[in-house]
């Protein structure tokens, strides 16, 4: 949701040079990529030198998107994109894959078809085009998002199955759009009366003048390769780079000396470096130690930040770290708190002009979302899923749960059967903390038009996170909006404090800073205090790696349970936790997993049917078009030339597990069974058939009688064909002979 003021790491305040531009347009990316790739797309007709240059450029684009420069992703290996790892085929595949990625990134507003790729790549690589294109499409690397041109590519009929998605946040919305494009039936159940989840843009103001205020996730953290940047480009929404200048002020309102500020920042970063060295030495022992305790011991060991002003400055950096992790340093794992650092998105941190609701609104378009549906029970099994929300039951083939980790920790949803123990343990181990805000709309910008952030020190360490950082949203919100952040221990006490008291304290801080400068701080027109920890649909802000946890716990949360229950959300992504783009990417990931699960199930059914269709299958189908005796699921055929009651015939029992699923109203049933009608056979005498007909109680009782009293065993078509070939042949011959005689009699 929130991010620290940093460029490349959550460890440090940004030291980047100030940008000369206040705003920039992501649409310029189209021109940049086009310039590198050339004006024409006729790759086949390029010179060797041109092709080599383009291949290098496309490789760099792929690297910026997280692909290895000369290897396959683990997902690609699992998907079997090439027949043999290593060698020429893999190298050729990588070139084709990179070309497809670059082509789509060149214009993310247009659907990239497989046919378009075939126009620019030699025919000899057609099989690699299909392999790479299908992988990139189904795993959400191309053709994702909200471009209006994509709607025409959604199948008219949803034949892939049905999915219930719990939660209309970024994860749920991303998954829903992907699944619809794959041909699934989808509904979203959302407990709130709005979409977005922890991304919440509130409109405040008066007399028709309203502004956008971000009460939840606010900053796009690193624009390079960020899927939210792709959405912004598709919607032609400009982004505002968060400028680097972040002056700090003492508790009395006077500015912090810049030299002292730099000195303490160096101390802070060196302490973190020492933590890294120490945990390497300690090995597994660091697993049980908090980051806060190690930092404090090192501070005392090196005798740094001993006077009040230096300690307050160091506390400010600690508060910034607690903001980045939504947790107190005393809770963060010294061993793994920064395990996601290698995966951080590059580039500037940005605000979205007009607020993040613009992304949410676009993602919601065309999706069936049911608001006010707080889910309390999820039942899942071999036959599908049932989701209970209040007094309503919803049925589908699969369910995707995207609720926040805080909701899972509170056991607000009952799972039947219970989740696997390893997943429950991961839910318990991972941390889920707080970040709160005071959002204020003022009559005018008094803090300076050229300032996006400024910070304030606190006298007491336990209050270091209280109003420690201010964000000015006047550049993107449509008005003079200022937001004060509350992190760490202060965020917890904030939850039970009186809003008017909190506002007075914020104004006191602001007036302490600006009054000595001769600047009057007016009362806000309107203000809002968040309470994310008390919100029953989140119970917190975002996740972190707590003591005795590790990054692998994110992987455990992401694991599906069988092929019916799936999980997404920021707390299910090891690489991008606690970020908006992480939530979005997890939705794309789970859409791919659901699609793959269906493919596996369909392949299983196809192989099962093929296995049970023997050479006599056509004969069996012919015989049972007109059975001699039929009741319920039971059909019988006999040799009409043999009247003996002990003579043998064939019995077919047809199992159709989709019976009863029906096409009920959407609110009560949303299932489209994968299962096919399954005919099974056995031999049976005329006498036994009539015995079976007399059994009362319906088909279940007849089946029980057939097995237990008559001792009959059902077989597939192939088995019965091998076992009863002569019997089948005799009955067919009799039927055909009878038909020929009848034909001759009926002729004039």
Q: Whereabouts are the PLM-identified features?
A:
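Long, charge-rich, low-complexity intrinsically disordered regions
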Residues: 1-100, 126-140, 144, 148-152
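Plant-biased detector of terminal regions, especially N-terminal secretory signal peptides
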Residues: 1-12, 17-19, 243, 247, ...
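FAD-dinucleotide binding site
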Residues: 43-70, 74-75, 112-118, 132-134, ...
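Short, composition-biased local secondary-structure segments
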Residues: 85-88, 96-106, 187-208, 328-332, ...
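Short amphipathic alpha-helical interface segments
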Residues: 94-121
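Short, proline-centered helix/strand-breaking motifs
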Residues: 108, 403-409, 639, 656
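Short, basic interhelical loop/turn and adjoining N-cap
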Residues: 123-129, 716-718
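Feature captures hydrophobic
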Residues: 616-748
């Amino acid at each position: 949701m929130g991010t620290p003021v940093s460029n490349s790491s959550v460890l440090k305040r940004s030291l980047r040079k100030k940008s000369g531009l206040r705003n920039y347009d992501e649409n310029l990316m189209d021109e940049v990529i086009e310039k590198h790739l050339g004006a024409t797309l006729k790759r086949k007709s390029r010179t060797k030198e041109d092709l080599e240059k383009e291949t290098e450029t496309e490789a760099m684009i792929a690297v910026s998107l997280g692909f290895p420069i000369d290897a396959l992703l683990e997902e690609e290996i699992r998907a079997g994109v090439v027949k043999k790892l290593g060698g020429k085929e893999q190298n050729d595949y990588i070139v084709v894959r990179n070309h497809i990625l670059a082509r789509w990134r060149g214009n993310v507003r247009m659907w990239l078809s497989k046919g378009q790729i075939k126009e620019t790549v030699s025919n000899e690589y057609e099989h690699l085009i299909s392999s790479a294109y299908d992988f990139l499409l189904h795993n959400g690397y191309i053709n994702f998002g909200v471009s209006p041109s994509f709607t025409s590519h959604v199948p008219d009929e949803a034949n892939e199955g049905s999915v219930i998605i719990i939660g209309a946040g970024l994860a749920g919305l991303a998954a829903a759009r992907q699944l619809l494009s794959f041909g699934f039936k989808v509904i979203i159940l959302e407990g709130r009366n709005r979409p977005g989840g922890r991304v919440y843009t509130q409109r405040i103001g008066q007399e028709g003048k309203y502004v956008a205020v971000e009460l939840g996730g606010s900053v796009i953290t690193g624009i390079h390769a960020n899927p939210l940047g792709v959405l912004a480009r598709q919607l032609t929404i400009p982004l505002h780079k968060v400028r680097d200048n972040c002056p700090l002020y003492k508790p009395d309102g006077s500015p912090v000396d810049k030299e002292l500020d730099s000195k303490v920042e160096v101390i802070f970063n060196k302490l973190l470096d020492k933590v890294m060295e120490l945990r390497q030495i300690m090995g597994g022992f660091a697993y049980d130690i908090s980051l806060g305790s190690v930092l404090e011991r090192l501070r005392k060991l090196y005798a740094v930040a001993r006077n009040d002003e230096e300690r307050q400055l160091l506390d400010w950096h600690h508060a910034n770290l607690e903001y980045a992790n939504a947790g107190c340093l005393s809770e963060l794992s010294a061993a793994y708190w920064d395990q996601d650092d290698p995966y951080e998105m590059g580039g500037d941190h940005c605000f979205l002009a007009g607020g993040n609701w613009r992304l949410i609104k676009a993602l919601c378009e065309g999706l069936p979302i049911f608001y006010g549906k707080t889910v309390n029970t999820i039942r899942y099994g071999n036959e599908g899923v049932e989701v209970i929300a209040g007094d309503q039951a919803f049925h589908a083939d699969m369910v995707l749960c995207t609720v926040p980790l805080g909701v899972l920790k509170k056991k607000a949803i009952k799972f039947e059967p219970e989740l696997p123990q390893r997943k429950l343990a991961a839910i318990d181990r991972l941390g889920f903390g707080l970040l709160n805000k005071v959002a204020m709309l003022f009559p005018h910008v008094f803090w300076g038009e050229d300032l996006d952030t400024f910070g304030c020190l606190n006298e007491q360490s336990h209050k270091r996170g209280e109003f420690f950082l201010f964000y000015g949203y006047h550049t993107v919100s449509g008005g003079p909006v200022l937001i004060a952040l509350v992190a760490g221990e202060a965020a917890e006490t904030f939850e039970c404090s009186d809003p008017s008291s909190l506002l007075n304290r914020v104004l006191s801080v602001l007036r302490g800073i600006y009054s000595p400068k001769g600047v009057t701080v007016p009362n806000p027109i309107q203000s809002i205090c968040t309470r994310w920890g008390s919100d029953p649909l989140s119970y917190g802000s975002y996740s972190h790696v707590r003591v005795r946890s590790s990054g692998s716990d994110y992987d455990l949360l992401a694991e599906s349970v069988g092929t019916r229950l799936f999980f997404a959300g920021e707390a299910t992504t090891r690489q991008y936790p606690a970020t908006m783009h992480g939530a979005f990417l997890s939705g794309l990931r789970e859409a791919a997993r659901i699609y793959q699960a269906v493919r596996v199930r369909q392949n299983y059914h196809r192989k099962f049917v093929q296995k049970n269709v023997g050479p006599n299958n056509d004969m069996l189908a012919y015989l049972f078009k007109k059975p001699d005796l039929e009741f319920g699921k039971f059909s019988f055929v006999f040799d009409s030339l043999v009247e003996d009651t002990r003579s043998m015939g064939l019995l077919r029992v047809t199992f159709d597990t989709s019976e009863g699923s029906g096409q009920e109203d959407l609110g009560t049933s949303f299932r489209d069974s994968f299962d096919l009608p399954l005919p099974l056979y056995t031999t049976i005498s005329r006498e036994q058939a009539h015995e079976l007909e007399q059994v009362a109680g319906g088909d279940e009782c007849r089946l029980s009688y057939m097995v237990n009293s008559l001792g009959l065993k059902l077989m597939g078509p192939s088995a019965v064909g091998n076992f009863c070939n002569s019997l089948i042949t005799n009955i067919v011959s009799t039927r055909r002979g009878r038909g020929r005689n009848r034909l001759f009699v009926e002729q004039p």
